[in-house]
Amino acid sequence: MANILLLLHPTVVTDQHLVENVKADIRKSVGDAHVEQHIIDRVTRGEVELTRNTYDKIIYINPNVHNRSIPASLMKLVYETLIDEGEFSGDLPTDQALDVLMTGFIVSDTNDQCWIKPKPIESVSIPLRRKGKKTDASVSASSGTTALPLFKKLSSNSNNNNNSSSPIGLTDSSAANTDEETDEANVMKRKLDAAKLTYFSDSDSENEEDENDDIINEDDLIKDSNQLDLRSRLIIPKSCEIPNGKKRRKACKDCTCGLKEIEEQEEAQQRSLQDSILGKMAQSATLEAIKIEERLKRQPVKFKDEDLAEIDFTVEGKTGGCGSCALGDAFRCDGCPYLGMPPFKPGEIVSIDSLGEDL
C-alpha cells in the first residue's frame, strides 16, 4: 500500500473543497493508499516530525499563485522523507531549479512541477589487469584487497655499471611499466597542461581588467574643466590689455576673446537669481494677505452704541465728519442731508421736509 503525504499551505482554508478533490483524484489514480495531511508551517517549524524514507509521493497544495516559493531547508526535509524514486509534486515553483538540483532532486521531463528523488547508484570496483607475471600484489587485487607496492634495493653489480655519482635507485617489484601506465601518465600530463592554460588565461584577463581600471575617460576630464571658473580659463589678446598690466573689467564693443559671453552669462544668472527671490517674496506676501483676510473674516467688526449715535448738526459744537455742512453745498459731502439747502449758522434750527418722506 502506497504512503502519500499532503502538505497544505495555510491559505488552503479559502477553498473548502480543494483538499477533498485532491483526495478523490488520488483514490482514482492509486486506489487503496494511506493518505496523511499536515500544514506545511508546522512541518517547517518542527512541530510535526516526519519519518525518513517513508512516503512514496508527497503532494504540495498551495492555492496562492503569487507565492509558491519553497525554502531550501524544507526541500531537504522532503527529500529525506521520500523513498528512492519517490515523487514530490503539486503546486511547486518553477523558478528554483538550482535549489532543486542542489538538494538532490531531478526535475521530471514531462512535468516541471514534479521532482523525483533518484535511486542511488552503487559503486562497482573493477580490477585492472596487468601484463607480465602475476605477483602477490596482483593476486591480492583479484581477491578484492589492495596491497602496498614492494620495493627492493638494486644489487651492487648493477650499481657498478651505472655512474658512480648517481644515487641508489629503488624499483617497484609489485608491477612493471606497462602501456596502460604510459597512457595514464599522458592523460595526467594533458590535464596538467590544460590547468596551467586555464590559470594563465584567468590571470591575463585579470590583468586586462586592472589595465581597464587605470584608463581615464576623456568625457570626465571635459566635465571637470567645465566646472572651473570661466574667467580663469579666459585668454585675453594683446590688443585688449591695458598699459598698466591690469585686466579689463568689461568687454570691448567688438569683443572676440569671449569676455562678452561670460558677462552675459553672469548677468543671466544674476537675473534668474533676482527673479527667483522676487517670486518667493511675492508668494510669501500673497500667503500673508490671505491669512490676514481669513483672520478678518473670523473676527467681524462690531459697532458700539456710541458709534451709531446720530449727530445733530444744528447744535453748536457738534459737527459731522467734515464739519463744514453749514457753509453750503460746496463744502458738503455727497451723502450730506443738507444738500440743496442754503448755508446756515451753527445752532440755527433747520427743518428738512424730505427727510420725513423718506422715513
From Swiss-Prot:
Essential cofactor(s): [2Fe-2S] cluster; [4Fe-4S] cluster
Any one GO cellular component localisation term in the record: mitochondrial intermembrane space
Residue span of motif Cx2C motif 1: 322-325
Region of interest: Fe-S binding site B: 322-336
Binding site for [2Fe-2S] cluster: 240, 252, 255, 257
InterPro entries: Anamorsin (IPR007785), CIAPIN1 (IPR046408), Dre2_N (IPR031838)
Ranges for region N-terminal SAM-like domain: 1-159
Biased composition regions of type Low complexity, renumbered to the chain: 155-166
Bias kind Polar residues: ranges: 167-177
Residues at which [4Fe-4S] cluster binds: 322, 325, 333, 336
Main location: cytoplasm
Entry keywords, A to Z: 2Fe-2S, 4Fe-4S, Cytoplasm, Iron, Iron-sulfur, Metal-binding, Mitochondrion
Region (Linker): 159-228
A Gene Ontology BP annotation from the UniProt entry: cellular response to oxidative stress
Region annotation (Disordered) ranges: 152-187
Motif (Cx2C motif 2): 333-336
Segments for region (Fe-S binding site A): 240-257
Cellular localisation: Cytoplasm; Mitochondrion intermembrane space
Entry GO MF terms: 2 iron, 2 sulfur cluster binding; 4 iron, 4 sulfur cluster binding; electron transfer activity; metal ion binding
Domain statement: The C-terminal domain binds 2 Fe-S clusters but is otherwise mostly in an intrinsically disordered conformation.
Entry-linked HAMAP family: Anamorsin (MF_03115)
Functional note: Component of the cytosolic iron-sulfur (Fe-S) protein assembly (CIA) machinery required for the maturation of extramitochondrial Fe-S proteins. Part of an electron transfer chain functioning in an early step of cytosolic Fe-S biogenesis, facilitating the de novo assembly of a [4Fe-4S] cluster on the scaffold complex CFD1-NBP35. Electrons are transferred to DRE2 from NADPH via the FAD- and FMN-containing protein TAH18.
Family: Belongs to the anamorsin family.
PANTHER family assigned to the protein according to its UniProt record, in alphabetical order: ANAMORSIN
Quaternary structure note: Monomer. Interacts with TAH18. Interacts with MIA40.
Protein name listed in UniProt: Fe-S cluster assembly protein DRE2
UniProt lineage: Eukaryota, Fungi, Dikarya, Ascomycota, Saccharomycotina
